[in-house]
């Protein structure tokens, strides 16, 4: 074989090797559970890094940056519909350099692109999908998009970039400048004071969106928003605002009684899809439960309602039984979905109940439970499945049943314990064992607040265990690991 032929053979083989290396999914060796969950997609995902950015610049391809987290229900829906589909993957791989980002691993990237998404669309959420120039400047953004519409978006944006590049660059520059202006807004110095009139004005503007009947903010999906509730509670005490105080009480009671509250294991789901706190998306996030410890602690001090105190113990029980690792640090989240061995997924299976199932487990107690937790049209979700949902107070229910509160609590605890035993036999949703320093710090604060309120050392001891582990494992030479 001549030297020229040998040269071309080696060149072609090496070129094909480089091409095959470039055209493959690169997530298998990542640490993030979320990224690993996408490692078998036909989409040629990169993790964020120089390799992906250089590939986009060298090929003059747009970046497609998809941001989510392992416990996000709609992230998994979009994966199943689009990212596991060969036709969609072909469009994505041909026209884009595709990057997967775990927002919990890279909150810096999540913050930057969320600002851009809100700037471009007026709202945000996850999964967050951004199409950007090879240098990372956004030109299109969206959240969950159904498969057919997703393909249309991909073709339209990539086609626009190829045929009207100057217009795309001009728009990208406007987005870049908008994000820069957002970044220029600096927080006020901590010692800066505001007039009473301004504080009242700002609080009342925020309060406009409160739902006085069902609690929470707005009339659609409901998120607990514990930091906002804490603000309203402090403001109502300082300025004797009874409307705000009543709103906080209503919200916390509705959350406690709602389907957003896991009455069996303790802990709260991230949000509900309705405005009455009934049907949750079933993921559980550490940062929500950590902050809910604080607001229920503060609320118990103000309202002296034992229901609020009981939620402190329920959250503690959840953290202890489901979220604590061997090193005493707290995991980040539990998925909304149950993953079965046959490859199928189903949202909420671990948490919901069928009426016939409850009848077999509870026997004579079924009627009691069906009235308390509304195993009827009020508590119905879908496919003969129910989400436990309380609509009257424990006191009202006791009066209706002709029992005292002590008898009631004893029976409820026995029934919940029985249901917990049965539920533990189910396939469990995936726990993301990622340790996030700031979320563990929030948990310490919530536990300390709970200790101050109850004087129960169980909360302080838990806080000290977490604090000691954080100090040993996540602080090195005064540098804090994220």
Role assignments for model-derived ranges:
Residues 5, 10, 243-251, 458-465:
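Short alpha-helical "patches" and their helix-cap loops
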Residues 323-332, 458-482:
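Catalytic cores of carbohydrate-active enzymes
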Residues 20-446, 450-454, 481-482:
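Replace the tail clause
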Residues 1-22:
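Bacterial Sec-dependent N-terminal signal peptides
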